[in-house]
Amino acid sequence: MDTLLLLKAAIMGVVEGLTEFLPISSTGHLILAGSLLGFDDAKAKVFDIAIQTGAIFAVILVYWQRIRATLVALPTERQARRFALNVLIGFLPAVLLGLLLGKAIKAHLFTPVVVASTFILGGFVILWAERRQQAAVRIHAVDDMTPLDALKVGLVQCLAMVPGTSRSGATIIGGMLLGLSRKAATDYSFFLAIPTLIGAGVYSLYKERALLSAADIPLFAVGLVFSFISAWLCVRWLLRYISLHSFVPFAWYRIAFGLVVLATAWSGLVTWAE
């Protein structure tokens, strides 16, 4: 396989790994990177599933101790069952809304103006959330969440169906606005990412199954590995970062990137369509 193509796959994997779990929208960055690299044909949809799988493996590895402990304790411990139930409750709204409105959203909302607007608006929402964070915290750990808290965050996660919103951004900032601490909101966002991304990946793989080819396995493998490594490093870094810092820098980054979306679309440099 062409070495240049494998290099592009590695770059796309790194972009996915670095942006999937930060509140900055991986989709917007993948479209921009794919367009600039010429890595945006029909098979790119299947490739996106591969690199997203690498990111999922990374967050599972980071939280493996907690995941394993929960699975082992499910038959005997009420807290483990409550935690698993909260993840399930948070996951379901996105499933239902995705099945009902997914096609319509992709058909009508994937435009430069929408993507840029959600990037910029999301930046200002982060700034607002951080301003009220200290006074609003009532939940300091994921284990303190109620099923109603989980449902509310799950409903907020549905906003991520709008291009440019960011799934992690919606759940983390939404959680903070609902009273979760920065750490609790981030942890729950990552736990919620596991079933959400797996479900989305399986559904997308089924839809795009006609594009699968054994010849593309090396390409997908490179993307998956680089996505896994970069996502693992990114998640571990973010968990350390939020113990000392706020999400304000990500807010300004989103606002700037939204302007980049508009500039690249108006110049014709990037085609902002899925």
Curated annotation (Swiss-Prot):
Its main location: membrane. It holds the Pfam family BacA. GO terms for molecular function: undecaprenyl-diphosphatase activity. It is found in: Cell inner membrane. One of its GO terms (cellular component) is plasma membrane. It catalyses: di-trans,octa-cis-undecaprenyl diphosphate + H2O = di-trans,octa-cis-undecaprenyl phosphate + phosphate + H(+). Its EC number is 3.6.1.27. It is a multi-pass membrane protein. Belongs to the UppP family. Bacitracin is thought to be involved in the inhibition of peptidoglycan synthesis by sequestering undecaprenyl diphosphate, thereby reducing the pool of lipid carrier available. This is Undecaprenyl-diphosphatase. The gene is uppP.
